[in-house]
Each structure stands twice: as C-alpha cells, then as structure tokens.
C-alpha cells in the first residue's frame, strides 16, 4: 500500500489535474531550474572572487561583499524554487493518502477546494519572493558599490568596490523577475481553468 501512495504522489507531482498546471510543471521544473542551475552558476559562480575594493585586500573584499550580498542570488532563488513547490507537494501527498486519482480531483468539491488553496499559496509565495528579490537585489546591478567600512575601524568610512559583470547580472536578474511573473500568471490562469471545468461538471446532465 505504501508503494501505491508513493506512486500516486509521484504521478500527482508530475501530472497535475489541469492542462495549465502540467505546463506550469514543465516550465517550472525544466526551463526555470535549468536556467538557474546552468546560467546562474556561470554568471554568479565566481562573483565573490572577482569582487574587489579599494584598497584591494582580502579582509576588506570579504567584508564588503557580505554587505553587498546579504544572501547570494543562487541560494535565494533555490530557496524560492523549493518553497513554491511545497503547497503543491503537500496537496498531492494528501491526494495520495486519500487514494484520489488525478482525474477525480476536480470532480470532488473538497479536493478541488484544497487544490485551489494550494495554487493560491503558490501565488502568495511567488509575490513574496518577487518583493524580497526587489528588496535584496533591486532591478539594476550598478558597476560601483560604495561600502560602509566603519565597522573595520578604517580612516575612511567608505570604500569603492567594483562589481564584476554587472551588465550580465542585470540581464539575469530581469530574467528571474520575468520567470516569477510568468509563474504567477500561470497560477492565476490555472485557477480560472479549474473554475470553468467545475462549472462544466456541474452543468453536465445527470445520468
């Protein structure tokens, strides 16, 4: 029986009950993850090594880099991907435990409500991630970062630091914002698909 639960959970995660949900899984699981894993590493992989300040000393560079990046973009986006997956995973675990097939989810009022709640939670998490990303990284990466070095007891309170490949990072940052907006729109469209399909089931003649 436990193997059947795992099978149902696995199929639910890969094949949601809606067409838009299946496209979202493909887009989310393939394109977005590939973009972050491959291109994200290429753009941000050696950022800390090439981040240099004036004067160019390791202690100062590390201090200012930690000020420039309270959290690295790769870690933030990886956490975003995992967090947004949680509501859907919890729902499909519930469906697997209740032995609800994917084809039956939208036929049952209670499971439909739970599924809509999971989609709404995904929207909320994506909006929250968008806000956090804008707060942490902004929308443009400037080539110069003015670092406050007061905590190091330096004569000068500000050190000028060079941000490597700032233009590439701006492009990548814009792409991640775009991915977030696309997934939000897909989730909204999925809710409309669910509502239309439920109306279709309710309007079917009784046999």
Curated annotation (Swiss-Prot):
GO terms for cellular component: connexin complex. One of its GO terms (molecular function) is gap junction channel activity. It comes from the Eukaryota. Disulfide bonds join 53-161, 64-147. InterPro entries: Connexin, Connexin_CCC, Connexin_N, Connexin_N_sf. Residues 1-22, 96-111, 197-207 are cytoplasmic. It is found in: Cell membrane. GO terms for biological process: cell-cell signaling. SMART domains: Connexin_CCC (SM01089). The chain crosses the membrane at residues 23-43, 75-95, 112-132, 176-196. Its main location: membrane. Belongs to the connexin family. Beta-type (group I) subfamily. Has significant hemichannel activity. However, has only low-efficiency gap junction activity and probably does not function as a gap junction channel in vivo. This is Gap junction epsilon-1 protein. It comes from Danio rerio.
């Amino acid at each position: 029986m436990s193997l059947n639960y795992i099978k149902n959970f696995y199929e639910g995660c890969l094949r949601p009950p809606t067409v838009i949900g299946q496209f979202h899984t493909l887009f989310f699981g393939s394109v977005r993850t590939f973009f972050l894993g491959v291109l994200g590493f290429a753009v941000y992989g050696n950022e800390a090594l090439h981040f240099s300040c004036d004067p160019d000393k390791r202690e100062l560079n590390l201090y200012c880099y930690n000020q420039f990046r309270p959290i690295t973009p790769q870690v933030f986006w990886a956490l975003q991907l995992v967090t947004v997956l949680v509501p859907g995973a919890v729902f499909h675990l519930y469906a697997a435990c209740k032995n609800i097939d994917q084809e039956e989810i939208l036929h049952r009022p209670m499971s439909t409500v739970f599924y809509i709640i999971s989609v709404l939670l995904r929207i909320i998490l994506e909006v929250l991630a968008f806000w956090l990303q804008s707060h942490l990284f902004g929308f443009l990466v400037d080539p110069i970062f003015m670092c406050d070095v007061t905590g190091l007891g330096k004569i000068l309170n500000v050190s000028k630091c060079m941000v490597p490949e700032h233009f590439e990072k701006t492009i990548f940052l814009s792409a991640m914002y775009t991915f977030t907006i696309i997934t939000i729109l897909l989730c909204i469209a999925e809710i409309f698909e669910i509502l239309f399909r439920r109306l279709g089931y309710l309007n079917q003649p009784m046999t």
